[in-house]
Amino acid sequence: MKQNKINKKFVYLISPNKIPDINFYDDLALVLSSKKISFFQLRLKKETNLNKLIIGKKIKKICNKHKVKFLINDDPLLAKKLNADGCHLGQKDMDLIKARKILKNKIIGVTCHNSINLAKKAINDGADYLAFGAFYATKTKTVKYRASLTVLKSIKKITSLPIVAIGGIKLSNYKKLLLNKANFLAISGYIWNNKKYKPLEAIRKLK
């Protein structure tokens, strides 16, 4: 996976925890049409595998239309079934080496929290990108680890892999992460749960 410099497609969009209604797919298409998004990750922790498959098929078509890479959270087998572009692995998910056997040359990213040691292991195991966070407080998931801006500078000294920043990213703080060398920003709540802006308006504010 090629590393992006700061550009207009720095958003790594994550789905809401639950697909709210049928209108979500229209909102997603509008957001992806903004041309600010490189990746979309389907993250539905509480859905059945069957529902994930049904939802994933719909979303994959939308991602393909807008040339956005479609990734699955935690589940390499589902990613293979959907012929997704790859998957994202947390530290408690399937081992990266096992996931690579399933997904071959697909994109596999790994959560590294705030740890350079976890990042080094992921690099050695063949990760395509590294994710650090949470950088800020977030309501999307329970935060067990907080990351500092210094980890972004430190990781850049040892790898050229793309770096994804995660956690509580919104209009008031996103530029600081880009200026500190994050290649992509994983964003969810700011887009889907924004009380001030609709999804398309919210994504357009990120310039």
Curated annotation (Swiss-Prot):
Top-level lineage group: Bacteria
Binding-site residues, 4-amino-2-methyl-5-(diphosphooxymethyl)pyrimidine: 41-45, 73, 111, 141
Pathway as given in its UniProt record: Cofactor biosynthesis; thiamine diphosphate biosynthesis; thiamine phosphate from 4-amino-2-methyl-5-diphosphomethylpyrimidine and 4-methyl-5-(2-phosphoethyl)-thiazole: step 1/1
Keywords: Magnesium, Metal-binding, Thiamine biosynthesis, Transferase
Keyword DNA damage in record: no
Cofactor(s), by name: Mg(2+)
GO BP terms in the entry: thiamine biosynthetic process; thiamine diphosphate biosynthetic process
Catalyzed reaction equations: 2-[(2R,5Z)-2-carboxy-4-methylthiazol-5(2H)-ylidene]ethyl phosphate + 4-amino-2-methyl-5-(diphosphooxymethyl)pyrimidine + 2 H(+) = thiamine phosphate + CO2 + diphosphate; 2-(2-carboxy-4-methylthiazol-5-yl)ethyl phosphate + 4-amino-2-methyl-5-(diphosphooxymethyl)pyrimidine + 2 H(+) = thiamine phosphate + CO2 + diphosphate; 4-methyl-5-(2-phosphooxyethyl)-thiazole + 4-amino-2-methyl-5-(diphosphooxymethyl)pyrimidine + H(+) = thiamine phosphate + diphosphate
Cofactor mode of binding and number, as noted: Binds 1 Mg(2+) ion per subunit.
GO cellular component, as recorded: cytoplasm
Residues that coordinate or bind Mg(2+): 74, 93
E.C. designation(s): 2.5.1.3
One of the Pfam families matching this protein, by short name: TMP-TENI
Positions annotated to bind 2-[(2R,5Z)-2-carboxy-4-methylthiazol-5(2H)-ylidene]ethyl phosphate: 138-140, 168
GO molecular function, one term: thiamine-phosphate diphosphorylase activity
Summary of the function given for this chain in its UniProt record: Condenses 4-methyl-5-(beta-hydroxyethyl)thiazole monophosphate (THZ-P) and 2-methyl-4-amino-5-hydroxymethyl pyrimidine pyrophosphate (HMP-PP) to form thiamine monophosphate (TMP).
Similarity annotation: Belongs to the thiamine-phosphate synthase family.
HAMAP family: TMP_synthase
Protein name: Thiamine-phosphate synthase
Phylogenetic placement of the source organism: Bacteria, Pseudomonadati, Pseudomonadota, Alphaproteobacteria, Candidatus Pelagibacterales
GN (gene name): thiE
